[in-house]
């Protein structure tokens, strides 16, 4: 499920040609279409995605400079750079910010707040991937460098949160970091000790997209009803993505059970969108959910 976000967002005109190369209904084609929706729907949304990509590239260049182009840095950041979910959370934020908007079109100032929130989600996601890929087999230098890089990205996310000047969003997104750490510890514990498997999955895979979507709605001053719908869409989408990536069981009964659960998650995500107006952003979110179960 590799997804050429970074190169694509610097050249929005390439969307059509890339789509022609992708299998219709595939994960990559669905996400490419979603980017296209944002590009058509508003020049500002398209610009925000492009700016975010350039800023992440610039951040990587900064870290390279500080570490004297340490060759270990490439190894440390490789899991993030190769991640199929790179820039996925910012895309969710921008789609949900469009789907949940109430009343007049957003101002330029509000678009900038969308960008800050999108950047926060990507910084947290990048830091988490770098941290969870730290292994005992790595050298002390690798471990120290990976820890520092991940911590630096979390620090940058904290600064962006402060600039949003929204206490509710600061608390929610800070709790995402705590959720990811708690989920990581839970996954390392055995059997009945520690967290249940369901709770661990929620912490590791579902709360990040759920709370990112919720915060996009909060920026729009949406009603609690809309806020709940945004949260539920992100939660069930996260759960379905985690289950879809689970290794296929050789047991037919287990496989059927997992498929049934996956379909339920996808249907729950889609039903959450029923409260939104029928616009392209909503349709893009619907297609993203549908693509998970294919």
Swiss-Prot record:
SUPFAM superfamilies, A to Z: Terpenoid synthases
Chemical reaction(s) catalysed: 7 isopentenyl diphosphate + (2E,6E)-farnesyl diphosphate = all-trans-decaprenyl diphosphate + 7 diphosphate
Record keywords, A-Z: Isoprene biosynthesis, Mitochondrion, Transferase, Ubiquinone biosynthesis
The keyword Mitochondrion belongs to this UniProt entry's keyword annotation: yes
Enzyme Commission identifier(s): 2.5.1.91
Top enzyme class: transferase
Signal peptide (from-to): none
Pathway: Cofactor biosynthesis; ubiquinone biosynthesis
GO molecular function, one term: prenyltransferase activity
GO CC annotations on file: heterotetrameric polyprenyl diphosphate synthase complex; mitochondrion; polyprenyl diphosphate synthase complex
GO biological process: isoprenoid biosynthetic process; ubiquinone biosynthetic process
Localisation: Mitochondrion
Protein family (similarity comment): Belongs to the FPP/GGPP synthase family.
Function field: Supplies decaprenyl diphosphate, the precursor for the side chain of the isoprenoid quinones ubiquinone-10.
Subunit structure as annotated in this protein's UniProt entry: Heterotetramer of 2 dps1 and 2 dlp1 subunits.
Name recorded for this polypeptide: Decaprenyl-diphosphate synthase subunit 2
